[in-house]
Swiss-Prot record:
Keyword Cytoplasm: yes
Cited PANTHER family: D-AMINOACYL-TRNA DEACYLASE 1, D-TYROSYL-TRNA TYR DEACYLASE
Record's catalysed reaction(s): glycyl-tRNA(Ala) + H2O = tRNA(Ala) + glycine + H(+); a D-aminoacyl-tRNA + H2O = a tRNA + a D-alpha-amino acid + H(+)
A GO term, aspect molecular function: Ser(Gly)-tRNA(Ala) hydrolase activity
GO CC annotation: cytoplasm
Keywords: Cytoplasm, Hydrolase, RNA-binding, tRNA-binding
Name the record gives this protein: D-aminoacyl-tRNA deacylase
Length: 148
């Protein structure tokens, strides 16, 4: 499982011109599900995202997590995070989970996250327009297999 985590002051997702998700201070997470991801990958990624200390405390030091800050979470499924562009010019997406498995895992991720923080999402497999204001900017890449 891969994620691009961005600290944002605001983020929104539109589908067919309609806002389907919107948050204020929190994290915008693009999440890619790999074909062999398990519950262990899901749990590792969720704990990492919720507890990543990338929010500033009263001294200006990045010392607070999303949970500690009480921030919101925008989750958007993005299979292209699993693209492999090392050969040729067209990325290969063979490592991405098939849509049915990816949706099942993504939905479980959303459900578990929603039990702990306010969550908004995009629409799975829809063409989305994602806009955000990256606060910092702060952007972190995560991989449950630690491949970076």
């Amino acid at each position: 499982m891969r994620a691009v985590v961005q600290r944002v002051s605001e983020a929104e997702v539109k589908v067919d011109g309609k806002i389907v998700g919107k948050i204020s201070d929190g994290l915008m997470v693009l999440l890619g599900v790999q074909k062999d991801d398990t519950e262990k990958d899901l749990d590792w990624m969720l704990e990492k995202i919720l507890n990543l200390r990338i929010f500033e405390d009263e001294t200006g030091k990045m010392n607070l997590s999303l949970l500690e800050k009480g921030g919101q979470l925008m989750l958007v499924s993005q299979f292209t995070l699993l693209g492999d562009a090392r050969k040729g010019r067209r990325p290969s997406f063979t490592e991405a989970a098939p849509p049915d498995k990816a949706k099942e895992i993504f939905d479980r991720f959303v459900k578990k996250a929603s039990e702990r923080v306010h969550v908004e999402t995009g629409v799975f497999q829809a063409h989305m327009l994602v806009s955000l204001t990256n606060d910092g900017p702060v952007t972190i890449l995560l991989d449950s297999r630690k491949q970076f």
